[in-house]
Amino acid sequence: MSTVAWDFAERRLGLNLDILYPNGTAYNFRVIQDYTTGTQFTIFERYRFCAKQKAPMPEPENCIPGNTSVRFRGFLGAGKDRIDYDLYTMKLTKEETGNLEGEGTFSVVRGTEYDIPLSNSFIGTYFDGETPYAQVSNGGYYNIEIGIDDPKRWFDVPDYCPKELTDLTMIPKHIPKWTWIRLPAPRLF
C-alpha cells in the first residue's frame, strides 16, 4: 500500500510505500521529489538510510495528458450520491517515458471544483536499461483530501540524508533493492 501527497503549488511529491515480497518480508520507505531543486530522496527510516538522486523527468503536471482518449463515461451511485467519471487510455512509448512502453488507463471523477483520480492501470514493458520486463500494474485511489494537513511529515528531509548524489552501486546489502520500482514521474499513475 502507498500513500501520496502532491503539492503542485510547491512542485513536490511525498510518497510512503510498503513493498511486500512473496517470502513474507516487508519494507517501508519514503520518497520525496522536489522539482524546485530537481532532487529525489529515497528514505528507509528503519535503517537510517537515505539516497539522493535526480528527480525523474518529466515533471508531473496537474492535468490530463494531451495524448489520451476518453474510452468510457460512467457513473457510480444514484440520485444525489451519483458520481460521474471518465475512463481514459493512452499509449506510452519508451522514448517518451524513458523506461515504459505499453498502454495505460486511468479514470477520473468529474467534479464541480476538482477532477479527482479514481484508478489506474498499465500493461506493457518496463525497461531496466535495455533489458525488457513484462509489467502489469493496477492502482486505486481512496480517502482523497484537498490540502495537506502536515507538510513536514511528507516533505522534510532527515538530517542523515546526503548532500551529494548517491552512487547506487554502493548501497549496503541490508538495504532492499528498490531501484527497479518505477518511482513516479507520473501523470496519474
UniProtKB/Swiss-Prot annotation:
MF-aspect GO terms: calcium ion binding
InterPro entries assigned: Ependymin (IPR001299)
Coiled coil regions in record: none
Keywords in alphabetical order: Developmental protein
GO cellular component, one term: extracellular region
BP GO terms, sorted: cell-matrix adhesion; flagellated sperm motility
Tissues and organs where the protein is expressed, per its UniProt entry: Endoderm cells.
Protein name: Development-specific protein LVN1.2
